[in-house]
Design a protein with these regions (language model features):
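An amphipathic alpha-helix signature
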Residues: 26-34, 38, 55, 59
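Short helix-loop boundary/capping segments at the starts of domains
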Residues: 39-42, 67
Length: 153
């Protein structure tokens, strides 16, 4: 009934050409991270946009996320070892073998540089090859042109 792959919990990074996806740890929860979550431009299309975030609320969220069957990765630029955002694989349905993905590039100076595209490719490779999922769902608000463009790649 459930995939034998549902118990895979990744402790290693997914390696790309320019970015690595690193399983999210508390060390990524910094003041810089909180600044992203306080930036209306960054959170406009995210569920967190209406909440005041603190180190404690984010730590609790990450701990709940990491103790579930969901995956959250920090997107880190390899060359400079810089955390620029996160990508998730969640709401995994093992019976029908699909999941939802979400991405946030929090550091706006890295928007439109292809880092999100590479991160998504790494996540999809992991989802399809390692977890043996068949479908990944991604959505975008009608006025989120960057999200729509990203979803059509």
């Amino acid at each position: 009934m459930c995939s034998e792959n549902k118990n895979i919990k990744l402790n290693k990074s997914l390696k790309g050409n320019r970015v690595d996806l690193i399983p999210f740890k508390e060390e990524f929860i910094t003041e810089k991270y909180l600044d992203w979550l306080s930036d209306i431009e960054v959170t406009k299309y995210l569920d967190v946009s209406n909440y005041d975030q603190t180190i404690d609320t984010i730590t609790n969220y990450i701990n709940r996320f990491n103790n579930s069957e969901n995956y959250i990765f920090a997107i880190v630029i390899k060359e400079i070892n810089n955390h620029i955002g996160n990508i998730t694989l969640q709401n995994i349905n093992w019976v029908h073998k699909f999941a939802t993905e979400g991405i946030m590039i929090g550091d706006k100076k890295y928007w439109k540089d292809g880092y999100g595209t590479e991160a998504r490719s790494l996540l999809l490779e992991f989802a399809f090859n390692d977890l043996k999922l068949n479908r990944i769902v991604s959505s975008a608000f009608v006025d989120n042109l960057a999200g729509i463009k990203s979803n059509t790649k």
